[in-house]
Amino acid sequence: MFSKFATRRKFLNCGKLSLLFLLNSCSNLPNKVKIALQNSFYPESFKDAIPKDWKQEKINFESLQLQKNRNAILNSEFTLINDGWISSIDFSEFEKINEYALFENLDKRSIDFLGSFDQNLSSKLFPIGVVPYTIIIKNNKELITSARTSWDFLLSEKLTGKIIFPQSPRIILSIAQKINSSNSLKKLKSQAMLFDDKNMLNWLINSDAIVAIVPYSLCSKYLKIDPRLSLVFPSQGVPLMWHFLLSRSNLNNVILIKWIKSLENKSIVDKLVSHGWYLPFNSDYLQSKYKTEMLPISGPSKKCWENSWSFPVLTLSLIHI
């Protein structure tokens, strides 16, 4: 009788010890790596390429003053941002990304672009993607032919009140500077139907608009559902939108390097490019994606890339380093 109780007591004690060991093991597991990003900025193929065991924290750069957005950034190891929102970020909250293994991956275009920033700022920015703007034309073969060489076609009388522009003065100004006409900015603005960054393609499909100028990465699903739409990348070049990664701690460099290396997988590269997202790295396979001479639907030509342009930060004085 006594031996039965002793055996049962041993069994219960072993069970307690196993439970304590399990709880202790769970408590020692590392927390999930968090990466903050604005969901609407990124194609699904890019979000799918983020490690599955990372937690994607959704933020909105238009509402950075809201505490929930600030908390999401402060509680995340990494943050993704594009060049249009750099001046809204307090860079003192981020660390320098000083890992040579990361920066040796970058191509000449991204290195040159980083060189346009203040050194204290550029040391905290890691280029993770470059997206060319594209012209989408609805049902007009004549305009498509004209658009393939330059931006001058935007001043056509047929397009008065028929163009949807980005809600970005610097993009509109940069395009106006490419147009061979006096008072090109004033004339260009008079062609506008509206200025919009969120629903431009819906407007194009469901209105009398004929042309929209949008980031390539936002186009793919619309091209599949509406055969009236055609993509054009003028050989004169297009504006480029850059995306960067910011880090809150250098303790995660090993994790970060592993992810960056994984993006160079050929199948991932192909998916990203098909959705308008180009990795600014120096591998031969990646660089071949910048040299296409195929139809415009496959992306900018080599000549278009060579003539394309990037934007420096508009207000460095507003950035806290």
Describe each region flagged by the PLM:
Residues 319-321:
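Conserved small/polar residues in nucleotide/adenosyl-binding loops
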Residues 83-89, 164-236:
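Ligand-binding pocket segment of bilobal, Venus flytrap-like solute-binding proteins
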Residues 27-92:
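Early extracytoplasmic/lumenal segment of secretory-pathway proteins
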Residues 159-168, 262-287:
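Periplasmic-binding protein-like
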Residues 97-106, 125, 224-239, 248-249:
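Short beta-strand->loop
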Residues 1-20:
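N-terminal secretory signal peptides and thylakoid transit peptides that target proteins
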Residues 78-79, 97-135:
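A structural signal for short loop-to-beta-strand junctions that line the ligand-binding cleft
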Residues 134-142, 240-256, 271-273, 281:
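A bilobed periplasmic-binding-protein/Venus flytrap-type ligand-binding module shared by bacterial periplasmic
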